[in-house]
């Protein structure tokens, strides 16, 4: 499989962006939602990377990315969730259900956080 390093880098970028917004918001609900996201995304990225390496071997250096646009965190998370859904079968074989399940958990965290940001913050 290819692209795992970029996939993990994408999750690291999400952590960086949401942590930055988390520290700069005046909304308690937004602060809490983003805090839950950046804590959760690192745990899931680590879980995914370890499982991936157990199946396919070492990933190698992680591709660290910089955000193109982060002024709207909801839009940023929506775009990333859509990208994850579009590349998931390029990163991991469709038949590798344990890793696909972790990707489901990752996407679920995005959607739960988007719900909190859109309707509770």
Residue ranges and their predicted role:
Residues 6, 30, 47, 55, ...:
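Context-gated lysine
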């Amino acid at each position: 499989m290819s692209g795992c390093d970029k996939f993990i880098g994408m999750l690291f970028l999400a952590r960086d962006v949401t942590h930055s917004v988390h520290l700069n918001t005046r909304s308690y609900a937004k602060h809490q939602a983003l805090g839950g996201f950046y804590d959760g995304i690192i745990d899931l990225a680590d879980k995914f990377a370890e499982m991936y390496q157990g199946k396919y071997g070492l990933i190698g250096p992680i591709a660290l990315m910089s955000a193109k646009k982060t002024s709207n965190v909801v839009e940023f998370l929506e775009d990333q969730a859509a990208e994850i859904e579009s590349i998931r079968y390029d990163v991991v074989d469709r038949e590798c259900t344990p890793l696909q399940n972790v990707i489901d958990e990752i996407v679920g965290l995005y959607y739960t956080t988007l719900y909190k940001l859109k309707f509770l913050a």
